[in-house]
């Protein structure tokens, strides 16, 4: 399902006065003695704070592991992956997720999305109910809340030969609607130009012309591109998968983050 529009030193100086050698020596002894008396409590305080952070991290880690649904595993996503012949590209330690499929016509479809962004999208159940009851769809009071529910999804489709052109579609996915809005369609001279993740390649992609706003295109062209994407598996089921997998991966990444933090503070 596709949507057509989105309203978018201290500077300090210290003066010292020369003092007799005997007095200076006495002052140093006094200072060292005091510093020794203060050091131990300060060290204890630091150790206590370190231990406190470690204990909290351990507690949070325990809670997260205990509340993990037993049925949640990568296997739970196999129905969708097998149906559309998508393969999951595992990216441990990264926000970005990727799934890939090869079509019967020899095209390769890459779908990229940010699991942290999607897992933290607000979801307003009340607004969802209001939308269902409103025959005209979303009213003005709900529009601002709805616009906060969009996440970026990038779909890159390439031909069989690596030297052939590729097209990158920048999409906005709405969690509540299970729908996609095409923001732009950008052609590239090769797969490498579209997918290379080097800093130089990313800068080049930022500078390239991305075409006019999708909504400014001829309506028939819009419809045909949307139908093309749907035929490649960009549909409500993909939106549901992206939402569910993002929750799964983001939670696993959070547990991994807690474990790494705990190692430092313990």
From Swiss-Prot:
Keyword Mitochondrion set for record: yes
Source organism superkingdom: Eukaryota
Gene of this entry: MAM33
Organism per entry: Saccharomyces cerevisiae (strain ATCC 204508 / S288c) (Baker's yeast)
Protein name per its UniProtKB record: Mitochondrial acidic protein MAM33
Positions where Phosphothreonine occurs in the chain: 91
Gene3D superfamilies found in the cross-reference section: Mitochondrial glycoprotein (3.10.280.10)
GO cellular component: a single term: mitochondrion
Principal localisation: mitochondrion
Family: Belongs to the MAM33 family.
Location in or out of the cell: Mitochondrion matrix
């Amino acid at each position: 399902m596709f949507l057509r529009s989105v309203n978018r030193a201290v500077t300090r100086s210290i003066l010292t006065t020369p003092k007799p050698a005997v007095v200076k020596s006495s002052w140093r002894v006094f200072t060292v003695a005091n510093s020794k008396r203060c050091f131990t409590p300060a060290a204890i305080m630091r150790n206590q704070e370190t231990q406190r952070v470690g204990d909290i991290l351990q507690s949070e880690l325990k809670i997260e592991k205990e509340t993990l649904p037993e049925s949640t595993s990568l296997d739970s996503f196999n129905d969708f992956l097998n149906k559309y012949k998508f393969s999951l590209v595992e990216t441990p330690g990264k926000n970005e997720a990727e799934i890939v499929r090869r079509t019967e016509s020899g095209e390769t479809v890459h779908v990229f999305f940010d699991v942290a962004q999607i897992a933290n999208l607000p979801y307003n159940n009340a607004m969802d109910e209001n939308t269902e009851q409103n025959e005209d769809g979303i009213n003005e009071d709900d529009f601002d809340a709805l616009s906060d529910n969009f996440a970026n999804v990038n779909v890159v489709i390439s031909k069989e030969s690596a030297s052939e052109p590729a097209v990158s579609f920048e999409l906005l996915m709405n969690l509540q609607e299970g729908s996609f809005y095409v923001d732009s369609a950008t052609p590239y001279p090769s797969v490498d130009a579209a997918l290379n993740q080097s800093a130089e390649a990313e800068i080049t992609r930022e500078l390239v012309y991305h075409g006019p706003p999708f909504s400014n295109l001829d309506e028939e062209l819009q419809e045909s591109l949307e139908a093309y994407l749907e035929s490649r598996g960009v549909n409500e089921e993909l939106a549901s998968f992206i939402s569910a997998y993002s929750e799964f991966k983001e939670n696993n990444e959070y547990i991994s983050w807690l474990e790494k933090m705990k190692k430092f503070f313990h």
